[in-house]
């Protein structure tokens, strides 16, 4: 069983430990949060998200109340009733066991259920195939590919824009 709660500064140590190197850090946050993440840099990002309105960071806990993941709801766009997910990260020891899929489904349920969004979007770097596979397993589909979104270590990283709708979510989520 997974639980979701708002991010707390005490979660920063766990998040920092999930990121093994600068490449993994860039895949997670596009370098929008300092490396390595600290309570201060995560707190700053939380404040920025809060200032945008519906944005917030969340921590995902396992049955033993141990942090195993995090994500952010970055905005609710009222014009098109869309919520956007970002900063999705899973503890290395939780990967490959379906926990990421469940975490993403909980994030989607929050957006549809509590925020009333009609669609939920996210972006994923093309180099992060495991994450893209997880998002597809949770019901997201590709809508666009952007050739060059970030330069890292001499590489151009493209992104996939992905979306899930209420109707599609109902086929993937038994909530």
Label each residue range with its predicted role.
Residues 83, 118, 125-129, 148-175:
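C-terminal "cap" of GNAT-fold acetyltransferases
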Residues 101, 126-144:
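Conserved active-site alpha-helix within GNAT-family acetyltransferase domains
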Residues 98:
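Glycine-rich phosphate-binding loop
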Residues 6-12, 17-95, 104, 110, ...:
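Acetyl-CoA-dependent GNAT
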Residues 1-2:
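Extreme N-terminal starter segment of soluble prokaryotic enzymes
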Residues 65-69, 130, 156:
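Glycine-rich acetyl-CoA-binding "A-motif" of GNAT/NAT acetyltransferases
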């Amino acid at each position: 069983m997974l639980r979701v709660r708002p991010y707390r500064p005490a979660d920063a140590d766990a998040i920092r430990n999930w990121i093994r190197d600068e490449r993994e850090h860039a895949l997670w946050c596009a370098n929008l949060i300092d490396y390595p993440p600290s309570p201060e840099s995560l707190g700053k990002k939380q404040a920025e998200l809060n200032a945008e309105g519906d944005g917030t960071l969340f921590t995902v806990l396992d049955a033993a109340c141990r942090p195993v993941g995090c994500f952010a709801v970055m905005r609710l766009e009222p014009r098109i009733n869309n919520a956007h997910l970002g900063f999705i990260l899973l503890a290395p020891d939780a990967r490959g066991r379906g926990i990421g899929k469940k975490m993403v489904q909980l994030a989607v349920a929050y957006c549809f259920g509590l925020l009333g969004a009609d669609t939920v979007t996210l972006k994923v770097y093309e180099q992060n195939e495991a994450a893209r596979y997880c998002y597809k397993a949770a019901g997201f589909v590709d809508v666009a590919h952007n050739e060059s979104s970030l330069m890292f270590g001499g590489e151009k990283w493209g992104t996939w824009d992905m979306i899930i709708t209420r109707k599609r979510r109902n086929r993937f989520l038994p909530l």
